[in-house]
């Protein structure tokens, strides 16, 4: 699938790399599954970069429009899964 991730050009290079890894983790949760701790670790880093709930919702909406994958649903599923288990949507 070819599409552009929602990125804010005010983010540093390191933050952009982190965000791309986070988007890839969400894709992985939908496509193959991902270990809960890996996804939640990237989500914690995502929240450091995007602390605002409104901005998080905006990014989720933009990402869902281009990819079809919901960040919100993936994180909700991860919160329901036991530690060291696979998050698969």
UniProtKB/Swiss-Prot annotation:
For this UniProt entry, which segments traverse the membrane? none
Q: Member of which family?
A: Belongs to the UPF0223 family.
Q: Read off the SUPFAM superfamilies from this record.
A: BH2638-like
* Domain of life, per lineage: Bacteria
Quote the protein name from its UniProt record: UPF0223 protein BCB4264_A4064
InterPro entries hit by this protein: BH2638-like_sf (IPR023324), UPF0223 (IPR007920)
